[in-house]
Amino acid sequence: SRRQRQMCIRDSSTAATLTSLKLDNGEQLPTLEQYLKAAKKTKTQLILELKAHSRPERETLAVEKIVNMVKKLGLEKRMEYITFSLHATKEFIRLAPAGTPVFYLDGKLTPKELKEMGCAGPDYHLSVFQRHPEWIKECHDLGLKVNAWTVNKPKDMKWLIEKNIDFITTNEPILLQEKVSD
């Protein structure tokens, strides 16, 4: 049996504390820069989630540092940003290069509000689209992309595919590939 442990990481955690942590596989927790340098060696599209911080000023500082690091490493064209924080969403839109996809995760804004903000679209929990199935078409009509998370049941995958969703986040990628192929 695997040893289970929990880590509590806050926006006040220091880099020294975080990089001293060992992951379950024995590796050190990498810094964002180390992670991005490793990702640079691949062709993978990158999606970076910024967790909400305790204060807006901390989020702005985090967004500035992230956007600058991504630029320094030449990864702007492969990067997308997601966050539950409305403030951080607006900051990514303001500070990232024009056209960088920024998706809002919280499920509280309509397609029209997202479009007006400059978002690439919603990245909402499946239940939001079950309550508002019309939002998928509204997003597409506005030129937005749509992602649903975390979708693990075949019937939910099928429903979203039938609604022409653009992206699905899942813990069951093989099952999803089968549903897409059906």
Labelled PLM ranges:
Residues L29-A39:
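Short, charged beta->alpha transition segments
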Residues R10-T19, K41-L50:
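Short, basic/glycine-rich phosphate-binding loops at helix/coil junctions
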Residues R2-I9:
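Short, small-residue-biased leader/transition segments that mark boundaries at the very start
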Residues Q34, T42-D182:
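Short loop-to-alpha-helix "cap/lid" segments that border enzyme active sites
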Residues A16-P30:
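Glycine/small-residue-rich loop that forms an oxyanion/phosphate-binding "nest" at active or ligand-binding sites
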Residues K22-N25, A39, A96:
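Alpha-helix boundary/capping residues
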